[in-house]
Amino acid sequence: MKPNQLMDQFETLAKKLGFKIIHGKGDFAGGGCTLKEDKVIVINKLKPIEQRLKVLAQEFSLMNLKGVFLIPALRKYINEISNFILLGEENNL
């Protein structure tokens, strides 16, 4: 699946789970937080799309997605990123 298609799938997943993805600019990598009781994931739109996708995959890998339908390519991507992080190989992505 192409990076832009993965990004679209992450946007759909975020809406389904009640999250908002904020595309910001600045000196930050990105991540999840709660802002005035809203669940948000902030990603840096100045970073390459691969890095933005990695941030989203990391955040969604922390959530219980067992009962949530994901297209197989998205679930596979989230699992791959999660496994790299667990193995301490996130710098090799």
Regions found by a protein language model. Give the residues of each.
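Auxiliary, metal-adjacent structural segments of Zn-dependent hydrolase domains
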Residues: 1-29, 91-93
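Active-site scaffold of zinc-dependent metalloenzymes
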Residues: 25-50
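Short alpha-helix carrying the canonical HExxH Zn2+-binding catalytic motif
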Residues: 52-61
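Catalytic Zn2+-binding segment of zinc metalloproteases
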Residues: 61-73
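Post-HExxH zinc-binding segment in Zn-dependent metallohydrolases
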Residues: 75-93
